[in-house]
Amino acid sequence: SYKLKKNDKIDVHNFNFSERVNKKIKFIYSPTKKELFSNSIFIENNENFVVINKPAGIAVQSGTKSKKNIIDILRKTQEFKDARPYTVHRIDKETTGILIVAKNRKYAQLLTSLFRLRKIHKTYLGIVLGELKENKGTLIDILFYYEGRKKIKTKAITRFSVIDSNNNYSLLKLDPET
């Protein structure tokens, strides 16, 4: 096996490939410290917030299962020399994507409110096994989580549309509502 590194090139000639993959493929990537501290992860940097391209393989916040995380790393950067990083939303550890981190309480509250009011929209791309019967639709499921010892259930709604597909895989645009 080969661990992908930044700037590695992967050629994809056509999404509608005909060869069937008979085994599960799992890409595990953990960025190096050099990559995490490089300026290439910063998309926007101003006095109130940063927008970064969060790599897969690293958690946003510390937790029981994650030793390194984006917030602790940002604390050590020049961009947060005189500021404290505030998370305003999260992305799963294994997901690559845009992450906004506030540099002060005022912008943390503002950006958190904009996410809560759905003024800032998240969109994901995903590859799933098989072809979907419908090109557009809504996925509704129930999620469970705990607040302390209390089990909370909430509805999860995601709209999807098929961008491309073949007999084996479908490339989807996913827009979570909740």
Residue ranges and their predicted role:
Residues 1-178:
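RNA pseudouridine synthases
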